[in-house]
Amino acid sequence: MLEILYQDEWLVAVNKPSGWLVHRSWLDRDEKVVVMQTVRDQIGQHVFTAHRLDRPTSGVLLMGLSSEAGRLLAQQFEQHQIQKRYHAIVRGWLMEEAVLDYPLVEELDKIADKFAREDKGPQPAVTHYRGLATVEMPVATGRYPTTRYGLVELEPKTGRKHQLRRHLAHLRHPIIGDSKHGDLRQNRSGAEHFGLQRLMLHASQLSLTHPFTGEPLTIHAGLDDTWMQALSQFGWRGLLPENERVEFSAPSGQDGEISS
């Protein structure tokens, strides 16, 4: 069962778990766990995608309950009328607030994108980022005696493939758990010492104008246990009040206070 964050007669939003595909492609024909099919079975209605989240990313996934609803939502995404907010745990101390305007060359998959043009130049890519908190943990990683992490809020203003992951890697603050653009030593250390066994990138919030009612709509997605455990271990509880789960209890030996 997927957590349904919002549903009306036109739209449905779920909290996509890390590791789930949004829908099958011919490359993933045998995949058993797929968001679209699970939601369809769960609510007894066909759903229509309007945007995507990478497989390792968790958080708000918004779909239409008709082809028209899906089309109108997709149009809003394409025209950048929907505000997306993400949170990430990154390597090092990223403390400033700034806008990164750094064009990206399209990443092509050798199989899935074999018919795509390879001669496209860099495409505009803009991300607003803001450091929320930092921590230094007494765990050696590589040649350093301690390990530093940062909690970052991200708002992509464009929608390039892997944009947030690539932009943070460009800033030399790759997201923990990013196997393609990240720091392998940091990924291993985070998994071994702090249970960061996934890409630490979460789609926390979507804000839009409802395509049928015209009313403002904001949808929040709660954090999973890996995220909640990280916030507890790093002393960051209470920094993401709209996404932290009040029912989470930290493992023994860690800060187990419940925030409200």
UniProtKB/Swiss-Prot annotation:
One record GO biological process: tRNA pseudouridine synthesis
> Could you tell me the gene encoding this protein?
truC
Q: Where are the transmembrane segments?
A: none
Give the family per the record: Belongs to the pseudouridine synthase RluA family.
Enzyme Commission no: 5.4.99.26
> Mind telling me what this protein is named?
tRNA pseudouridine synthase C
Give the signal peptide as a residue range, or say none if absent. Answer: none
Organism lineage reads as:
Bacteria, Pseudomonadati, Pseudomonadota, Gammaproteobacteria, Enterobacterales
Q: Which UniProt keywords apply?
A: Isomerase, tRNA processing
Q: Does the keyword tRNA processing apply?
A: yes
Please name the GO terms that the record assigns under molecular function: pseudouridine synthase activity; RNA binding; tRNA pseudouridine synthase activity; tRNA pseudouridine(65) synthase activity
A Pfam family the protein falls into: PseudoU_synth_2
> Which InterPro entries did the record assign?
PsdUridine_synth_cat_dom_sf (IPR020103), PsdUridine_synth_RluA-like_CS (IPR006224), PsdUridine_synth_RsuA/RluA (IPR006145), RluA_PseudoU_synthase (IPR050188)
What role is this protein assigned? Answer: Responsible for synthesis of pseudouridine from uracil-65 in transfer RNAs.
